[in-house]
């Protein structure tokens, strides 16, 4: 059912974004970012609530103007999860949102300004126990680094990050995390690997501007998966040109696939072939949609025939092995006398899964949620 993963997490410092622990073995936090106009308070709060419902631990909000900062004050008061404020160009906005209760300040070294401005932000953060995220991006490196390296390289991204890491160290401020994002998978991966060797701050992972719902999910899964499998990463965001809720779903799917952190059902399903005794694809799609509300981690196998069906079912919390007219049901790896009608599989299997969820909750059974 949920096998241990062999990943050894990279040691890192502990900090807190609101009440969410980051680093030092804490569960890898999944976050997204709103794409509403921040000045539209109701729309932004509604999106934050939808993200929280999907499982977001943290939500980032862009605050590009002082008007947006004033709106953030109201948003923060209504948010069900900690909020990171995304600040570019004007350090004074960071000072204002710190005053209004931001849970983390994200600044970009490439455009926030001189060291004295960074010091002002650090002083505000220190006074209110707010962590900072140094966010380096391959598309917005400092001009001198662009000239030095000619193009974004891992060395350039890490040099940019280390400049500002060292400024914070010099200011005796250690409550920060770092990201070195790029849209190219290999560039991002190499940048994070290099940075991980230099500092013990928590690392926020991401492949920036990854793409649309499908291509972005694939690119992020490959890049973040490589790093996570090496034990690198303490929080992540999957960047998609799509509904931000999809970012949370993909983020948890990545962690679930690596057995790092489980949330909801892990469906194990065959791609189907002429041996299938029922419509596997439509059955799985329907159940994924119907069972999105379940947060308990479970393995559910849905296999269309008896070649691999029984074997997968033996290591699943709930399993279905296709057979003619009625398919075999397995609970906790044990075959049941009850067989499910192939003509009504979605309803019957959903009922069985929900019964198992109730049983687990009522008996407080440990379903082995692995938090790495």
Curated annotation (Swiss-Prot):
Keyword terms: 4Fe-4S, Iron, Iron-sulfur, Isoprene biosynthesis, Metal-binding, Oxidoreductase
Pathway listed: Isoprenoid biosynthesis; isopentenyl diphosphate biosynthesis via DXP pathway; isopentenyl diphosphate from 1-deoxy-D-xylulose 5-phosphate: step 5/6
Amino acids binding [4Fe-4S] cluster: 270, 273, 305, 312
Gene Ontology BP annotations: isopentenyl diphosphate biosynthetic process, methylerythritol 4-phosphate pathway; terpenoid biosynthetic process
Cofactor binding: number and manner: Binds 1 [4Fe-4S] cluster.
SUPFAM superfamilies in alphabetical order: Dihydropteroate synthetase-like, Nitrite and sulphite reductase 4Fe-4S domain-like
Protein name listed in UniProt: 4-hydroxy-3-methylbut-2-en-1-yl diphosphate synthase (flavodoxin)
Organism: Idiomarina loihiensis (strain ATCC BAA-735 / DSM 15497 / L2-TR)
